[in-house]
Amino acid sequence: QFREFSLIKLIRNGGLSSGDVFERWIDRLLNGKTFKEMDYNLHVVATDVARGKPVIFNKETTPDVKVSLAVRFSMSIPLVFSFKKFGKHLMVDGSILSEDALHRDWAQDGTPVICFRLKGDYEYDEIKTNGMFPIVQYISLLIRTFMTTISREYINDAFWHNTIIINTGECSAVDFKMSNDQKYHLFKTGYDTAMKIIPIKTNTSTLAPAMFSPKSNSN
């Protein structure tokens, strides 16, 4: 439901999808909340490609910005979702910068920071690049290669202790046709990995299990 792919959008805005449907969906789930209205001290990291630096959204720096807009900036996979302007910034995916943009004392009280790295084992079928207009196929190849490289990127030794690898199996970040069963399995894999590894990384005995929807109700 978030695809809305269009070559016109790619040519005009730098991405196959505007991401507007996703932004409205998040905004609806959050009841239109801004950062200052959040109960938690939430931080969202995006990347300003014009300056090559991270941009951090939170209740101190951007109190009146909607959380949905910041999340929309942060999830902008290049070429898949359009660049979006924010003041003088040109915003894209927050994860394309180095890891040190994420590993910082966000709570300012020494609370440990845990980063989750998604790593897939998927093998893509060969894409044919013949025909009169092979641009779509070439873009698909570029996006897939980019996402595969990101998922297998080397983890700095300094951040290994605070990084948890979640094996997504054959699920890909650019697979927009996953079934409900695949989505549930992906969620369950992340949940089980976190429950198993976080106590080890943080030297705690165990975590209290969280409640989540049963498989039959997954969306």
What annotation goes with each model-predicted range?
Residues 1-219:
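Patatin-like phospholipase
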